[in-house]
């Protein structure tokens, strides 16, 4: 803590709260990412096309996160000034953007990928996560982020082109609600397939990812986190759902969201996923049309 002089002349303590956004991502290498969108599995695209699309999603998500963190830092500075003027405790939030990848050789691959793209709004930190399972990879990435001094971690994947600044802000604001709670707690946002798209907790929370992925009792990821929190007695704060892209059906849904976000950005404070939108347009997949169907409830007594 540092000391600041308030307008009333007294010395007030300033606490710096360090927040980390931990983004998990592999390099956009053909055959390594988004394979369910490709002919290698149950998709329709060549691996080079799917990896190129993911490349755009990754950059869009990082840009959106950076924009959200800039907003959060500005708001924190304004609150700190108001608290100082009122002679109240000052909490100043700092944010760090961390990208975790695997294996270790891909750290430099990712660093070069972003460096070659030009200047980014803030420093990007690159880490390597290792382990024999998703659980172990995620646990190690969290451990490395705590070791960097983080007080709160909000983690997510990069295959979410419909992510908004509001989603990121909501995640950190929820974490801050838990900051003073004895024992801590978790925050999570569901995806569209019984999993989570965002998960995080505070430093004080004795929690990890063990047993969540490929749960031995058959639970999917969202109920596995809830079950784990319930058994350990931790509060959990629910964030708005954020869809990701794994399958062709996921992609269809996200195509409509990307189009809407890019249009709405003209009229609202939205950082649009413009790279993803451009890639979809170049692929000829920038709009979705569906054939009519009669799989609906009876309407004979309604439509007359």
Language-model features: where?
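Conserved alpha/beta core of the MobA/IspD/sugar-nucleotide pyrophosphorylase nucleotidyltransferase superfamily
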Residues: 220-304
